[in-house]
Amino acid sequence: MGQKINPLGFRLGTTQGHHSLWFSQPKNYSEGLQEDQKIRDCIKNYVQKNMRTSSGVEGIARIEIQKRIDLIQVIIFMGFPKLLIESRPRGIEELQMTLQKELNCVNRKLNIAVTRIAKPYGNPNILAEFIAGQLKNRVSFRKAMKKAIELTEQADTKGIQIQIAGRIDGKEIARVEWIREGRVPLQTIRAKIDYCAYTVRTIYGVLGIKIWIFLDEE
């Protein structure tokens, strides 16, 4: 049986860049890594609490962290930044204060920037959140997958594969269902493929959603 490698790690340095950009001594590396995780979790929790969205999509595509000795620069790539900014007029400042408290950064400045991504539904994280919202509302998984594929087609991608695993539709036996539209060349390294794995808690148990999106070839 073929073993699947993570498409993002497989393409690092060719079509994929790192989401954290900093250097540290080997003995301090683990602290830096934990700090990154803390920043990402804190931002996601804040957005979840303070954004009231009808579709259940928070719309965070990715969070990039750049560190220097005296500065931490956090760039949040969002599909719908208006929702965050409109729901709280001082949303970004509040988030910055929360993060500073959480990290306890005394002699370092923290900077947060929010960047809008052009085609939100061309991003697997946002799409996975959309599918998760549908499954929580007990929409049948096939309908949710088809709707997601329609949304990505509007975002002008070359191919998409969606996989849902777990107790689908509340069935006793867990199974894996998947659907593919267009091309998804996972073994071609120069193919720009975006990927995300997302867990969703439904009343029947946990479902895993995986999404591969083939954007273009270099």
Swiss-Prot record:
It is found in: Plastid, Chloroplast. Residues 47-118 form the KH type-2 domain. It comes from the Eukaryota. It holds the Pfam family Ribosomal_S3_C. Keywords: Chloroplast, Plastid, Ribonucleoprotein, Ribosomal protein, RNA-binding, rRNA-binding. One of its GO terms (molecular function) is structural constituent of ribosome. Transmembrane segments: none annotated. Its main location: plastid. GO terms for biological process: translation. The keyword Ribosomal protein applies. Coiled coil: none annotated. GO terms for cellular component: chloroplast; cytosolic small ribosomal subunit. InterPro entries: KH_dom-like_a/b (IPR015946), KH_dom_type_2 (IPR004044), KH_sf_prok-type (IPR009019), Ribosomal_S3_C_sf (IPR036419), Ribosomal_uS3_bac-typ (IPR005704), Ribosomal_uS3_C (IPR001351), Ribosomal_uS3_CS (IPR018280). Belongs to the universal ribosomal protein uS3 family. NCBIfam families: rpsC_bact (TIGR01009). Part of the 30S ribosomal subunit. This is Small ribosomal subunit protein uS3c. It comes from Atropa belladonna. The lineage of its organism: Eukaryota, Viridiplantae, Streptophyta, Embryophyta, Tracheophyta.
